[in-house]
Structures are given as C-alpha cells and as structure tokens.
C-alpha cells in the first residue's frame, strides 16, 4: 500500500468528523431539505394543510442538521472535538446515552426519504438548482461509501500480505 493511502486508512481519515460531516451529514441534510421543499410544493399545489406543516418541519429540521454538520466539520478542521453531534437525532441520542443508535435512525430516515422522492416521482418536481443539489449530495455520499469500502479492502489485503510475509507489488 502506498504511504499516502496507508496514512488515509491507518490514520482513520474516513472516520474523522470532517469526512463524516461533509460526506454523510451535509448530504443527508440536503436530502431532507429538498424533501421538505417538495412536500411544501405538493401541499400548495394540492391544498393539503397537514403537508404544509410537515414540509416546514422538514425544512427546519434539515437546516439545523446541515448547520450542525458544517459546525462539526469546522471544529474538526480546527483540530477540536465538536461540542455537538452531526445531526439533531444524534444529539438527542447523546442525551439518552445512545448517539450511534439515533444517528443510525437518522440514516434510515434519510435513505427512506431518498427512496420516497425517487419512487413517488417527486424528484421530477425539483428545479434546476435543486436537482443539482440532489445530484451533488448523491455523488458525494455514494463516492465516499465507495472510497471507504476500497480502503477497507486495501487494508485487508495489506494485513494478509503482512501475515503471509508477501512483498507488495
């Protein structure tokens, strides 16, 4: 494994608050924000009052989550531990002593939002800028998952080589 890749993998870059906030937190917040906007748009077109409230709640929730992720990344870049979690659900989980569980619930909700927007056809109601935001969030999120998987495999390969005393190519 090259030194730079080794440092990324062994140094845990893919587990740093900066990486996680920018590749998971912000994209998930963008999905929630666009979902809220789409809910508002649908509510106004179809005169569905409860959907208006739901849309506003989603927009506020998403906005807070995006701000929390950005602040977490800023603290990480400054070399400090963030006093807040990546999202509101993880923050609530911290108070209950289970931030990881609540962060996983947030991930499930975010993926459910993605599926709903795609399968309902709401994605067709995004304007040009909103669609680009959706594409950017999707790209960053998916590429980061692929990078983490690739580096995990490189680490496993390196460990196998070390165990077998095989020189790298």
Annotate the PLM regions.
Residues 46-53, 97, 125-129:
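Juxtamembrane loop-transmembrane helix junctions in multi-pass integral membrane proteins
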Residues 77-96:
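Juxtamembrane inter-helical linkers in multi-pass membrane proteins
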Residues 38, 42, 71, 75, ...:
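Membrane-interfacial segments
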Residues 26-35, 104-132:
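Alpha-helical transmembrane segments and their membrane-interface junctions
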Residues 59-75, 103-116, 151-166:
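Juxtamembrane/interfacial segments around transmembrane helices
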Residues 126-168:
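Alpha-helical transmembrane segments and their immediate juxtamembrane interface regions
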Residues 8-21, 91-118:
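Loop-to-transmembrane boundary segments
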Residues 1-79, 134-137:
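N-terminal first transmembrane alpha-helix
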